[in-house]
Amino acid sequence: MMYRNNLLISFDFGTKNIGVAIGQMKTNTSKPLESVSYVKGVPNWGKINNIILLWEPKYIIVGLPLNMDGSYQTSTIKAKKFAKQLRNKFFMPVMMHDERLTTIEAKSVLFKKYGYKGLKKKLIDSESAVIILDSWMNSIYFKK
């Protein structure tokens, strides 16, 4: 797989939908792509595969849902399993990044942009993926 311009894809893992965002390390920018729905109780791997093949990311970032005290919850284990599946299916680096409060921030961003019409679950999920990706990129740049 050829990597284009240090592109990144982030996933906001959920048990019904998975928010997806794309970003570029070179410009430190990101944008929402879509929300991938589950099919018969499992992630839509066909759609996820198409996204990965289309964008050819260098890295995949998956949100790590933690309790406010940093402890694990049920969704933490599921998100880690999802990240492992991505690693095994696509043979590329998959990093996890703390996603605490991203849904609240995503709702705030969308409400400011679109009012109540912006508060649709799929929009929230993909905007959460943007926030996860932005936070990951900022953490990388500030470590330098």
Curated annotation (Swiss-Prot):
SMART domains: YqgFc. Keywords: Cytoplasm, Hydrolase, Nuclease, Ribosome biogenesis. It holds the Pfam family RuvX. GO terms for molecular function: nuclease activity. GO terms for biological process: rRNA 5'-end processing. Its EC number is 3.1.-.-. The keyword Acetylation does not apply. The keyword Disulfide bond does not apply. It is found in: Cytoplasm. One of its GO terms (cellular component) is cytosol. PANTHER family: POLYNUCLEOTIDYL TRANSFERASE, RIBONUCLEASE H-LIKE SUPERFAMILY PROTEIN. Belongs to the YqgF nuclease family. NCBIfam families: RNAse_H_YqgF (TIGR00250). Could be a nuclease involved in processing of the 5'-end of pre-16S rRNA. This is Putative pre-16S rRNA nuclease. It comes from Wigglesworthia glossinidia brevipalpis. The gene is yqgF.
